[in-house]
């Protein structure tokens, strides 16, 4: 028989928000395809959505300043 799989752990969504007084600020970028409830992962040179696979590349600041 195959080994039993453990329970999946979920991320704490409260870590993705910053609350100051009555204002709430999102700390991570939201996916434009999935909507406001899905956050994108930030990698070295891109943002990626784990749900739909949408990817946005960051602009390279060095090449823009050299031109």
From Swiss-Prot:
Source organism, top-level taxon: Archaea
Keyword entries, A-Z: Metal-binding, Ribonucleoprotein, Ribosomal protein, Zinc, Zinc-finger
Keyword Hydrolase: no
GO molecular function, one term: structural constituent of ribosome
Cofactor list: Zn(2+)
Zn finger intervals (C4-type): 31-52
Presence of keyword DNA damage: no
Disulfide bonds: none
Gene Ontology cellular component terms for the protein in this record: ribonucleoprotein complex; ribosome
Protein family (similarity comment): Belongs to the eukaryotic ribosomal protein eS31 family.
HAMAP family xref list: Ribosomal_eS31
Name of the protein in its database record: Small ribosomal subunit protein eS31
Organism: Methanococcus maripaludis (strain C7 / ATCC BAA-1331)
């Amino acid at each position: 028989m195959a080994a039993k799989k453990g329970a999946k752990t979920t991320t704490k969504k409260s870590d993705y928000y910053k609350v100051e007084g009555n204002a709430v600020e999102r700390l991570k970028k939201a996916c434009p395809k999935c909507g406001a409830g899905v956050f994108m992962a930030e990698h070295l040179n891109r943002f990626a959505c784990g749900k739909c696979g949408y990817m946005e590349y960051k602009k390279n600041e060095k090449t823009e300043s050299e031109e």
